[in-house]
Amino acid sequence: MMELENYHAFHFVGLGGVGMCALARILIEKGITVSGSDVSDSAVLQELRNKGAAVFIGHKRENINNADVLVVSSAIGMDNPELQEAKSRDLPIFHRSDVLAAIFKWGKGIAVAGAHGKSTTSAMIGQIFHVAKMDPTIVLGGFTDYLKGNSCLGHGEHIIAEADESDGSFLKFATFLSVVTNIEDDHLDHYGTVENIRKAFVEFLNHVTYKDGGAIVCIDSEGVQAILPQIKKKVISFGINDSAEYRAVNKRYEKQNMLFDVYHYKEKLGTVSLQIPGIHNVRDALGAIVVALYCGISFETSVKALSVFSGVKRRFQTKMKEHGVWIVDDYAHHPTEIAATLKAAKEMGRHRVICAFQPHRYSRTKLLQEEFSEAFIDADVLFFTDIYAAGESPIQGIDGTLIPNLVKRRFPDKPINYVKNVEDLPKELYKAIKPDDMLITMGAGNIYMAGEMLANLMKGKGLSSDYKK
């Protein structure tokens, strides 16, 4: 296993990636030399430059001249010149999850995994620990206002991190608390079968290494329920389900805030108010509260922290709220996430919910096409674009028209539009939008830029054609 203390100069290939920049920031704050490269510049890379990182635009062999260890993610191909140079020089090469696993050894690790909600849940846990003055180290998969980024080096005993199950790397972490928000049939390109996915989560939950640690799980998930008999560690359950140890009940909206009551068995602990809508965020908040209670933080402190939690970037993030129109962006790219986000939007009582969706990966589109066809029930008007490949090669018969055709078959009365290129989408959305509408741009690719460009168009700033980032 990697020992951070054995290395002095880390080079990150793909430094601008959300998981990579979070780790780089931690190492810089720890006083470790960091360099890195990416294909294009960004605000994230500029921030790391300002903190002292040597940043290279473009991947070249000479970029790693001053490094004694290379860090890569699953997105880096074997033909990357920096990776090839590191191999030729016999430099140690580690996956980013190895760096995170090494950070977990600094203290009591709290790892959050699950098909959906792990970014928001881990961010909520971090905010609660901040308000409680626990000074945690935090590594997130999304950007938050309270961190002004997605990571921070703390001096307390807790390390809070999002654990990525997509490639199995979350099994490297030795934890104090392992949290699972849900288990679904995602990432089948890696696991092959749902059974293999569940086996991985069993191993993750059983990898709690502290005697006083435990497994905190959302029992609303059928996948979680299926593996409970195999969990050998202390289990604390939460959810809407009546059988949960900690329950969220009496969910309602007041002045666009989401309120719910929290019960521990039959004892009412109090009421929570969230700025972000939706039952999925209620579950995430409840999970964060349970983690905080387990670590000795009062319920009242959690309530205070969650009342000012503004969300995670690209998770129901407001882009514009003017001219009677509300433009929101959301990272949802799995059918369950899509359905939950649209349901939350519908419950907010706008005239129409318009959804512009960009499918993410050919493999996911193929494997979950039937689930996608059902996910858009709460959208009043739909726009679809071509598939965002995310580095995948095309699959014959799978393209951007697949999902809209299936949705049209299931919901023949819904207005459905196909706009192949994202850069053509803002003008089409501008024609469709009306006062009191909510528009949600949705997907894990570059669809968010369509909402930003539409906001500029509505504010009279015109359109930009920069859809590369």
Predicted regions and their residues:
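Nucleotide phosphate-binding/pyrophosphate-handling subdomain across enzymes
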Residues: M2-H11, G19, L23-K30, K255-Q256, ...
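Phosphate-binding loop of NTP-binding sites
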Residues: E3, I26-I32, R49, E62-N63, ...
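Beta-strand->loop->alpha-helix junctions that form or flank phosphate-binding loops
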Residues: S37-D38, F56-H59, F94-D98, V139-G141, ...
